[in-house]
């Protein structure tokens, strides 16, 4: 099954983008080649761009505190696995403490680093980080991989509490949903939501069908339409019945 996820609001959309960026960052940071570390560094700049939103930190803290208050009353409940509950609450409380310790504007340490700022300004120009443009950056790229890795890890460190918070919120959202098997008749599916509020929709489709879901929703109804990509042409709507799994997630 291939999993597709669709956010229902801007906050979840931002967290999904952050998750994708941090996963890409971790992958390229673990590599050895300077060109791969260049991708890790430019991804760090993208992360700083997304996390630089003034209200992101406060939004995450409010959501984590809300989840803590929701889960804490279940302590001592015999119907709840207490070890798992304590692990989640401990993770939330530690992440809240780490967020509270973040001082100043998010990502300001990258702005204040003149050398990184010069790389960042050139990185948005196609081919702008050639060795003749940034000889000091080229020299740094010749350092041992582990030394480069340590530098990049140091630069990402102040942003990690936001990664941890986003991870918790997305995990709790995903775990809140229950998958149901449904059928898109002639490639199209609709479902009434009756005014219920959801944050995230997951669509799982059989890999062998080679179909691509396109989704939209409002507070009353959701639509899923399946298309198929064939060569260089735009995806076209399919007219076959498509079985898939639908999960609606609500924090």
Swiss-Prot record:
**Which terms in the GO cellular component ontology are assigned?**
cell division site; cytoplasm
Tell me the keywords, alphabetical order: Cell cycle, Cell division, Cytoplasm, Septation
| UniProt keyword Ribonucleoprotein present | no
Q: Could you confirm whether the keyword Cytoplasm appears in this record?
A: yes
Describe the function of this protein.
Cell division factor that enhances FtsZ-ring assembly. Directly interacts with FtsZ and promotes bundling of FtsZ protofilaments, with a reduction in FtsZ GTPase activity.
The subunit field of the Swiss-Prot or TrEMBL record says: Interacts with FtsZ.
What's the protein called, per UniProt? Cell division protein ZapD
Its source organism is Burkholderia multivorans (strain ATCC 17616 / 249)
């Amino acid at each position: 099954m291939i999993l597709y996820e669709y956010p229902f609001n801007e906050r979840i959309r931002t967290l999904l983008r952050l998750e994708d960026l941090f996963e890409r960052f971790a992958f390229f940071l673990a590599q050895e080649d300077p060109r791969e570390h260049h991708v890790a560094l430019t991804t760090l700049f993208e992360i700083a761009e997304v996390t630089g939103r003034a209200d992101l930190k406060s939004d995450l803290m409010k959501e984590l505190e809300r989840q803590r208050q929701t889960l804490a009353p279940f302590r001592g409940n015999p119907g709840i696995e207490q070890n798992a509950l304590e692990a989640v609450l401990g993770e939330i409380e530690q992440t809240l403490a780490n967020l509270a310790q973040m001082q100043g504007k998010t990502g300001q340490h990258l702005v204040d680093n003149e050398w990184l700022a010069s790389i960042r300004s050139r990185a948005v120009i196609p081919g702008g980080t050639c060795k003749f443009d940034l000889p000091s950056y080229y020299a740094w790229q010749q350092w041992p991989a582990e030394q480069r890795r340590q530098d990049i890890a140091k630069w990402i460190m102040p942003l990690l509490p936001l990664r941890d918070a986003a991870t918790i919120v997305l995990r709790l959202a995903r775990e809140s949903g229950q998958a149901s098997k449904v059928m898109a008749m002639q490639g199209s599916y609709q479902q009434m939501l009756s005014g219920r509020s959801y944050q995230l929709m997951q669509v799982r489709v059989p890999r062998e069908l080679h179909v691509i879901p396109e989704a939209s929703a409002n507070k009353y109804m959701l639509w899923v339409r399946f298309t198929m990509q064939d060569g260089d042409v735009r995806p076209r709507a399919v007219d076959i019945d498509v079985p898939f799994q639908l999960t609606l997630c609500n924090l």
